[in-house]
Curated annotation (Swiss-Prot):
It comes from Rotavirus A (strain RVA/Human/Japan/KU/1995/G1P1A[8]) (RV-A). Plays a role in the inhibition of host innate immunity by inducing the degradation of key host factors required to activate interferon production such as IRF3, IRF5 or IRF7. Associates with components of cullin RING ligases (CRLs) including CUL1 or CUL3, which are essential multisubunit ubiquitination complexes, to modulate their activities. Recognizes the host NF-kappa-B regulator BTRC through the presence of a DSGXS motif in the C-terminal substrate recognition domain. GO terms for cellular component: host cell cytoplasm; host cytoskeleton. This is Non-structural protein 1. Residues 317-486 are annotated as: Interaction with host IRF3. Its main location: host cell.
Length: 486
């Protein structure tokens, strides 16, 4: 059983404030939610289990029980998850406020301990002080957190997470902030709490405390497309698709890291809860993570033989050719932008390849084919440039004054001509490596200009950012007809 979950279940009975703050979906009646196979820690109840996606950020960080309350660590309502979430630079004073919140919600004194022991011993089989009956008393106060970086902002979700060595398929990584506070001060807090426990439970408490307060922080993970809801990924290839999210909001005016101080004044806390409401947002999928996902899928479907072919049709419109036909049944081709990029890139590659080396037709087997698979994946700058350089070198360029050139005198379509004029100012007869890189970048940037894209989608924005963008009508970017260049 998850220690944090058990502590919330038992401690919520001691007063009105706790009954409100410590209310977890996992301790209430279960409501069905989409089952998944993602393993990790639920940020709401801290148990390690199968996770489902959050309705506030579409990432997998909530269990199927807690999902009924729709809480997200990015909310603006002072529920327990939000009050345990800190952002960016965390100071010693802010950590002291967090410890005070824990001490307020999970007090440990002689009266509380006797009360819990008395309630437990009403059952004949529970006369001994066994850990399974007193799990809620064995939750130490630690500065253990799950951290995530979203577009330059680092969020720390504090809690008590059991079984730290279990499978973690989420973008969150364990981080220990005890050094920012003070190990000895934290030790003293826990030794005082431990002194109220029966001797048979003190050893277990101490073991749990030291294992969760002395661990080495993990390396921070990179967020990728697999960390977001499969429902979002399945609809990425629809340019008009918008992600629907809900956020729990309130009129909370505190600085981000000071939300935990609200429990010190129960009256003020309940006044803020009276302003609680849900806000709905429809946001664009436009970001580097999802763009790279689409370009990677398209890269796997590349048919390099088109470069050596003599087809008059565009690369994605070749049919009944054993070597050049593209499988159009994949949903990635539903995005007309991907098709336009693919057609232009391969029309250009064919034009400057066929004039420089003696190549035949569709069935030709050329060395450059092995480098073509990364030609669309511009998000991975190192691999992409390596791919272009290798293709360029396969064309046996002529070197003059330490600059390599290839000839460019082959038929191209009007769309590519427009790109050439826009990117290098003319339709050239010779090309350098820099010209080739600039031209292919221009083709891709016309629709997906990753230079100006945020890394993660807008679903990871705080409510303040979402409100500002919503006011400026920028949460929804209509991708159906206007390119980045336009």
């Amino acid at each position: 059983m998850a220690t944090f979950k058990d502590a919330c279940y038992h401690y919520k009975r001691i007063n009105k404030l706790n009954n409100t703050v410590l209310k977890l979906g996992v301790n209430d009646t279960w409501r069905p939610s989409p089952p998944t196979k993602y393993k990790g820690w639920c940020l709401d109840c801290c148990q390690h289990t199968d996770l489902t996606y959050c309705r506030g950020c579409t990432m997998y960080h909530v269990c199927q029980w807690c999902s009924q309350y729709g809480r997200c660590f990015l909310d603006n309502e002072p529920h327990l998850l939000r009050m345990r979430t800190f952002k960016n630079e965390v100071t010693k004073d802010e950590l002291k406020n967090l410890i005070d919140m824990y001490d307020t919600l999970f007090p440990m004194n002689q009266k509380i301990v006797c009360r819990f022991i008395s309630n437990t011993r009403q059952h004949k089989c529970r006369n001994e002080c066994m850990t399974q009956w007193y799990n809620h008393l064995l939750m130490p106060i630690t500065l253990q957190s799950l951290a995530i970086e979203l577009d330059g902002d680092i969020y720390y979700v504090f809690g008590y997470y059991d079984n730290m060595n279990s499978i973690n398929q989420t973008p969150f990584s364990f981080t220990n902030l005890v050094d920012i506070y003070d190990k000895l001060l934290l030790d003293n807090v826990n030794f005082v709490r431990m002194s109220f426990l029966p001797a048979s439970l003190q050893q277990e408490y101490a073991l749990r405390y030291f294992s969760k307060s002395r661990f080495i922080s993990e390396q921070r993970k990179c967020v990728n497309d697999s960390h977001f809801s499969i429902n979002v990924l399945e609809n990425l290839h629809n340019p008009n698709f918008k992600i629907q999210i809900t956020r729990n909001c309130s009129e909370m005016s505190f600085d981000w890291n000071e939300a935990c101080k609200l429990v010190k004044n129960a009256g003020a806390y309940f006044d803020i809860l009276k302003t609680s409401h849900i806000e709905f947002y429809s946001v664009s999928t436009r970001c580097r993570i999802f763009t790279q996902c689409k370009l990677k899928i398209a890269s796997k479907l590349i048919i390099p033989n088109y470069i050596t072919s003599n087809h008059k049709t565009l690369a994605t419109e070749v049919h009944n050719c054993e070597w050049c036909s593209v499988n159009n049944s994949y949903t990635v081709w539903n995005d007309f932008r991907i098709k336009k990029i693919y057609d232009k890139v391969f029309n250009f590659l064919r034009a400057f390849s066929k004039f420089n080396i003696n190549i035949g037709h569709c069935s030709s087997q050329e060395k450059m084919y092995e480098y073509v698979e990364d030609v669309l994946n511009v998000c991975n700058d190192e691999r992409w440039k390596t791919s272009i350089i290798e293709i360029f070198n396969c064309l046996e360029p002529v070197e003059l004054d330490d600059v390599k050139y290839v000839l460019f005198n082959h038929e191209i379509n009007w769309d590519v001509i427009n790109v050439l004029v826009h990117s290098i100012g003319k339709v050239p007869q010779i090309l350098t490596l820099e010209n080739v890189i600039t031209i292919i970048q221009s083709i891709i940037y016309e629709w997906f200009d990753i230079r100006y894209m945020r890394n993660t989608p807008m679903v990871t924005f705080t409510i303040d950012k979402l409100r500002r963008l919503h006011t400026g009508l920028k949460t929804v970017e209509d991708d159906s007809g206007i390119s980045d260049v336009e």
